């Protein structure tokens, strides 16, 4: 496993990507736990998940957890208008 704490300051974002690297396929599953107790829609910072036939937008509400396969779903963090906090982790396979 691998985990980190992320703080996106106002004006931050993260471009569309996969969590599994081209040269390292050890990340099997991704998990994001949101830590934003006072989040409101105007705060932005939603997770945008690109499914094969539709796009899903997930609000970073406190206590909400998102879990997905690291090599299948591209995703991005939309522009934040307020600080956005989360713990992100990856369940890994192999050595």
Task: Kindly give the residue locations of the regions a language model identified.
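Catalytic core of non-heme Fe(II) oxygenases with the double-stranded beta-helix
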Residues: 1-95
């Amino acid at each position: 496993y691998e985990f980190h704490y992320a703080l996106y300051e106002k004006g931050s974002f993260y471009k569309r990507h996969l969590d599994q690297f081209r040269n390292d396929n050890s990340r099997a599953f991704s998990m994001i736990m949101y830590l934003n107790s006072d989040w409101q829609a105007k705060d932005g910072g939603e997770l945008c998940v690109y499914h094969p036939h539709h796009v899903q937008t997930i609000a970073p509400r406190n206590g909400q957890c998102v879990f997905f396969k690291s090599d299948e779903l591209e995703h991005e963090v939309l522009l934040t208008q307020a600080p956005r906090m989360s713990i992100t982790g990856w369940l890994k396979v192999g050595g």
